[in-house]
Amino acid sequence: MRNERITYEEQYQGHPIMTDKEKQLGCKEAILQKIDQIMTDMSNRHSKVLFMRYDVRFPKGYGHPNDNELFSQFQETFIKNRKRAGYDPAYIAVRECSREKHQHYHVALMLDGHKTQNIHDHIQTAERLWEKTLNLPPKNDDARRTTSYGLIDDCMRNRQGQPQGNGVMLRRDDPEYKHKYDQCFRRCSYLAKVNQKDSSPKHQREVFSSRIQH
């Protein structure tokens, strides 16, 4: 997605987004459009939707691939797993490759809020499936208990390390529904930000999403 339209406006389709005209921080309109489509579709399908974020990283020292095959394989397996569990998942993900953080993926996931109320099982399942995708050996803590590698960031802290919430229940009958929806849209717009330090290979796919159900 090169040479795409960038917006520096404060809103997209009436929803707040993460932009700053003075600092020339913009968002890619094509990704905002996809976010809008997926969030609208999920809110039409379910009167309660659980919105959550997570990031996917590779372990230190792991050879970072130049393609998206491992992430695509993981995400497909994870979404199939959540579908079989009855959560009717929908997602949008973006690849980011910077010199500081290397290759990683940002994901926004939406689930049927009648079937799930918190993020923890989904994060743990993602951890297990991502480690399996990477063929990582089992890891134990000091007490020899099985533990995870911590490669799925549950986004419970912001970039400054301060605690932040994750897992917002969007209930259509909630008087705060529009405000919460807008806050989720704004948080999701982080996936559309223009990364000035992006070092992704050209012609490499950077956006992944579930299909809109008609």
What is each of the regions a protein language model found here?
Residues 63-68, 103-105, 121, 203:
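Generic alpha-helix signal with a bias toward terminal, lower-confidence helices
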Residues 1-46, 113-214:
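Catalytic "initiation/cleavage/transfer" segments centered on a nucleophilic residue
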Residues 36-97:
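Signature for HUH/AEP ssDNA processing cores
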Residues 92-114:
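Histidine-centered divalent-metal-coordination microenvironment in nucleic-acid enzymes
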Residues 61-63, 100-101, 116-117:
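Eukaryotic short linear interaction motifs
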Residues 52, 56, 105-111, 126:
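Generic hydrophobic secondary-structure signal
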